[in-house]
């Protein structure tokens, strides 16, 4: 079981890299003229990971999925996919650039968006499988 969690963690990290590069390319192309340096990709990735974690945990709670599957997906894949340490580093980077308002807003969003997404995941799972 442990090796499966590790394997899924590696797959999650690769998926994060692909999504991160894709979002950054599109975001940088759109904002090249305005010079906006908002770390959108990390926020999106953590939101998606939290949404999926909410769905997975509520699916386990409603006994639609077994614990081994949840462990491989949530701890493995989503553990490799999400990147809250990068989000905190981006807040520190914005502070060092003296972009205090953006750092504060991004710091709040880094906590609020995943919480909202995990709650939405709970709701989606409940709608899909009412108890």
From Swiss-Prot:
Activity modulation: Na(+) is not transported, but it plays an essential structural role and its presence is essential for fluoride channel function.
Which residues of this UniProt protein bind Na(+)? 79, 82
Source species: Bifidobacterium longum (strain NCC 2705)
In Pfam terms, one family for this protein is: CRCB
Q: Name one GO biological process term.
A: cellular detoxification of fluoride
Cell membrane: present as a keyword of the record?
yes
**GO cellular component annotations of the record:** plasma membrane
Q: Which domain of life is it from?
A: Bacteria
Quote the subcellular location field of this record: Cell membrane
Known role = Fluoride-specific ion channel. Important for reducing fluoride concentration in the cell, thus reducing its toxicity.
Q: Identify the gene encoding this protein.
A: fluC1
Keyword annotations for this protein, in alphabetical order, are:
Cell membrane, Ion channel, Ion transport, Membrane, Metal-binding, Sodium, Transmembrane, Transmembrane helix, Transport
Give the transmembrane ranges.
38-58, 69-89, 108-128
Catalyses:
fluoride(in) = fluoride(out)
Protein name, as recorded: Fluoride-specific ion channel FluC 1
InterPro entries assigned: FluC
